[in-house]
Amino acid sequence: MKPLFQLSTRKYDDELVLVKKAMEELENNCKVKNGFEIKEPTLKAGWAFFNLELSTEMLSVIESSGMMINAQGFGFSEQLKNFIGHFLESKGSEVRIKNANY
Protein backbone atom coordinates (compact mmCIF):
# COMPACT_ATOMS: atom_id res chain seq x y z
CA MET A 1 0.00 0.00 0.00
CA LYS A 2 1.25 3.49 -0.84
CA PRO A 3 1.25 6.14 1.90
CA LEU A 4 -1.48 8.70 1.30
CA PHE A 5 -1.68 12.05 3.08
CA GLN A 6 -4.41 14.66 2.97
CA LEU A 7 -3.13 18.22 2.71
CA SER A 8 -5.36 21.22 3.35
CA THR A 9 -4.93 24.93 2.74
CA ARG A 10 -6.82 28.13 2.08
CA LYS A 11 -4.27 29.19 -0.58
CA TYR A 12 -4.33 26.23 -2.96
CA ASP A 13 -2.67 27.83 -5.99
CA ASP A 14 0.27 29.19 -3.96
CA GLU A 15 0.68 26.05 -1.87
CA LEU A 16 0.49 23.70 -4.86
CA VAL A 17 3.61 25.33 -6.32
CA LEU A 18 5.47 25.08 -2.99
CA VAL A 19 4.44 21.46 -2.37
CA LYS A 20 5.41 20.36 -5.90
CA LYS A 21 8.79 22.09 -5.65
CA ALA A 22 9.49 20.60 -2.20
CA MET A 23 8.44 17.10 -3.24
CA GLU A 24 10.55 17.31 -6.42
CA GLU A 25 13.53 18.23 -4.22
CA LEU A 26 12.82 15.27 -1.91
CA GLU A 27 12.45 13.06 -4.98
CA ASN A 28 15.88 14.22 -6.21
CA ASN A 29 17.41 13.67 -2.76
CA CYS A 30 16.04 10.12 -2.82
CA LYS A 31 17.20 9.61 -6.44
CA VAL A 32 13.73 8.34 -7.37
CA LYS A 33 11.60 9.08 -10.43
CA ASN A 34 7.83 9.41 -10.12
CA GLY A 35 8.14 9.30 -6.33
CA PHE A 36 4.93 11.16 -5.58
CA GLU A 37 1.57 12.10 -7.02
CA ILE A 38 -0.62 15.06 -6.10
CA LYS A 39 -4.32 14.36 -6.60
CA GLU A 40 -7.05 16.81 -7.67
CA PRO A 41 -8.37 19.09 -4.90
CA THR A 42 -11.78 19.16 -3.29
CA LEU A 43 -12.98 22.62 -2.30
CA LYS A 44 -15.12 23.12 0.82
CA ALA A 45 -15.89 26.29 2.80
CA GLY A 46 -12.85 28.18 1.52
CA TRP A 47 -10.49 25.26 2.05
CA ALA A 48 -8.82 23.08 -0.56
CA PHE A 49 -8.19 19.45 0.37
CA PHE A 50 -5.86 17.42 -1.81
CA ASN A 51 -4.05 14.14 -1.45
CA LEU A 52 -0.33 13.46 -1.69
CA GLU A 53 0.66 9.89 -2.48
CA LEU A 54 4.22 8.57 -2.15
CA SER A 55 5.54 5.70 -4.24
CA THR A 56 6.69 2.57 -2.45
CA GLU A 57 10.18 3.15 -3.86
CA MET A 58 10.38 6.66 -2.41
CA LEU A 59 9.04 5.43 0.93
CA SER A 60 11.69 2.72 1.02
CA VAL A 61 14.49 5.23 0.39
CA ILE A 62 13.16 7.65 3.03
CA GLU A 63 12.89 4.83 5.56
CA SER A 64 16.28 3.23 4.89
CA SER A 65 18.32 6.44 4.41
CA GLY A 66 17.90 7.72 7.96
CA MET A 67 16.07 10.89 6.87
CA MET A 68 13.39 10.29 9.50
CA ILE A 69 15.75 9.89 12.47
CA ASN A 70 14.55 13.08 14.19
CA ALA A 71 10.89 12.69 13.24
CA GLN A 72 8.70 12.54 16.33
CA GLY A 73 5.60 10.40 16.57
CA PHE A 74 4.05 7.26 17.90
CA GLY A 75 4.51 4.61 15.25
CA PHE A 76 5.96 4.71 11.78
CA SER A 77 2.96 6.29 10.01
CA GLU A 78 2.88 9.26 12.40
CA GLN A 79 6.66 9.71 12.11
CA LEU A 80 6.38 9.68 8.31
CA LYS A 81 3.54 12.22 8.41
CA ASN A 82 5.57 14.47 10.71
CA PHE A 83 8.68 14.11 8.53
CA ILE A 84 6.76 15.09 5.36
CA GLY A 85 4.99 17.92 7.20
CA HIS A 86 8.24 19.37 8.56
CA PHE A 87 9.95 18.96 5.20
CA LEU A 88 7.17 20.90 3.46
CA GLU A 89 7.23 23.55 6.19
CA SER A 90 11.01 23.95 5.83
CA LYS A 91 10.42 24.76 2.15
CA GLY A 92 7.92 27.53 2.94
CA SER A 93 4.66 25.60 2.77
CA GLU A 94 1.92 26.19 5.33
CA VAL A 95 -0.33 23.24 4.46
CA ARG A 96 -1.89 21.12 7.17
CA ILE A 97 -1.19 17.42 6.81
CA LYS A 98 -2.88 14.30 8.12
CA ASN A 99 -2.66 10.60 7.39
CA ALA A 100 -5.38 9.57 4.98
CA ASN A 101 -4.29 5.96 4.51
CA TYR A 102 -1.23 3.95 5.40
Can you describe what each PLM-predicted range is?
Residues 29-33, 65-68, 86, 90, ...:
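Surface-exposed polar/charged interaction patches
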Residues 17-25, 60-83:
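Extended Gly/Ser/Thr-rich low-complexity repeat segments
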Residues 10-12, 55-59, 100:
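Generic structural motif
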Residues 32-75:
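Short, intrinsically disordered low-complexity segments
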Residues 75-102:
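Amphipathic alpha-helical binding modules
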Residues 1-25:
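Short, extreme N-terminal segment that most often corresponds to the first beta-strand
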Residues 2-8, 51-53, 94-96:
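Ser/Thr- (and often Asn-) enriched beta-sheet segments in non-cytosolic proteins
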Residues 17-40:
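Short, flexible N-terminal segments of the mature chain
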